[in-house]
Amino acid sequence: MNMSLRWLPLLALLVATPAAAADNTDTALQQRGQYLATAADCVACHTAPHGQPYAGGLTVPTPIGSIISTNITPSKTAGIGNYTEQQFSDALRKGIRADGKHLYPAMPYTAYAQITDDDVHALYAYFMHGVAPVDSKPAPTRLPFPFNIRLSMAAWNLLFLDSKPFTPDPAKGAAWNRGAYLARGPAHCSTCHTPRNLLMAEKSSRELAGGAVGTWFAPNITADPTSGIGNWSAAELVAYLKLGHVSGKAQAAGPMAEAVDNSLRHLTDGDLQAIAAYLKTVPPRHDPADTRAVDSWGGPSAEPDMARTALPDDADKMSGAQVYDAYCASCHQARGEGSFDGGLPPLFHNTATGRTDTANLVMVILDGIRWHTDDSGVHMPGFAHELSDRQIATVGNWLLQHYGNPAATVSVEQVRTLRAGGAPSHLVLLARLAIIVIVLLLSAVIFWLLRRRKRSHTKTL
């Protein structure tokens, strides 16, 4: 009896060891899934302002109407808690929900299609076991006809969805392949940085050549040295992805600041270096309007020193120098040189003032900049409530003439449009007109066939 008791601790250890190993494996798998979800920046779209993580409810403006993000917590009543792994994979990589209905490509499943089976498995483990369920269902998306017919996305997918997962290029090194996988797949760089055609599909011939993201412009990040990031070093690219700014070149704002804040700064240095290595090899796409590198324009100017004269009674008649002196010079300095080792960036040698597309310059003045680092954060206030459309256009043009690309311009109408949320899209109207034309053509064909049949029948008689 005593001999049997001696073996009990050993037996307990043998039984416990596989369970502990399984727990460790599950934990490691969930941690890997969490890292991938961070790389994919899922939280950015699936979290409403001041809402619970991944509970959805964020309104995403698109050219076809506003799309409301869904709850992707493991809630069984409001989220994806009842999804099988295959259903999760189909939603992630094919844009098909568990009920068989199609998602809209505002959810970047065209990029997530590149994610490997193993990484989908890790993501599923994280979302099912590492995310807190939230039993709150967001309002449904209600798009205007004909885009409310989700089945139409099946045809769109046939035309534009490449459902093959990423395949490493054996001619490239491990770092390049890792960077290509992250950039093309989870990080979905092309979703924002590639222009789109009339049907809102990415133009593959212009991959990463720059595209509109609502009211912002996602710039060219190909290897072109003038229009893109070809003149950036790999170290500068890594610093930008990690910190959100590189002094003398650029600072993240708008959706890119969110991507840095929520996603990119949390990636390992090795992965950031891999992404940089890949981006440095993307085929260059040049914009003929760019005659020199967009971050090379301008120099310090002292004109604000001469702007401290009596202001006009009508604020809209203030000169650009006067607006700058009143609202900008306290941080960016009288000569536009910035301060604090680039924490307050110079306005020359800055992509915001060097591009011919001035949307980002206007949006920064309207909305400001907000992003964080591990140690601190940067906050530039927006002036949408302080400055009129004309004042913003005036100071914008003054900045371009003195610190940036003098060929670029800002118009009052442009400011008014961006302030209102961007130019209205005619895509819904065009789609409806196309349906009317198709119906008329089909009706004409049917009418012709019926008349032909009637004539044939008459001749027979």
Residue locations for each model-derived region?
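Extended intrinsically disordered, low-complexity coil regions enriched in Ser, Thr, Gly, Ala
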Residues: 82-87, 97-104, 195-201, 209-213, ...
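Post-cleavage N-terminal segment of exported redox proteins
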Residues: 1-28, 67-70, 91, 96-99, ...
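Sec/Tat-exported extracytoplasmic proteins
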Residues: 40-41, 46-49, 76, 92-100, ...
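C-type cytochrome heme c attachment motif
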Residues: 35-47, 70-71, 87-94, 105, ...
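Axial heme c-ligation environment in periplasmic c-type cytochrome domains
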Residues: 66-82, 93-118, 138-143, 218-229, ...
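Active-site substrate-binding loop specific to GH73 endo-beta-N-acetylglucosaminidase modules
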Residues: 55-65, 195-244
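C-terminal cell-surface addressing/anchoring modules of secreted/extracellular proteins
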Residues: 422-438
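Sequence/structural segment immediately N-terminal to covalent heme-attachment motifs in c-type
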Residues: 27-48, 53-61, 153-157, 167-197, ...
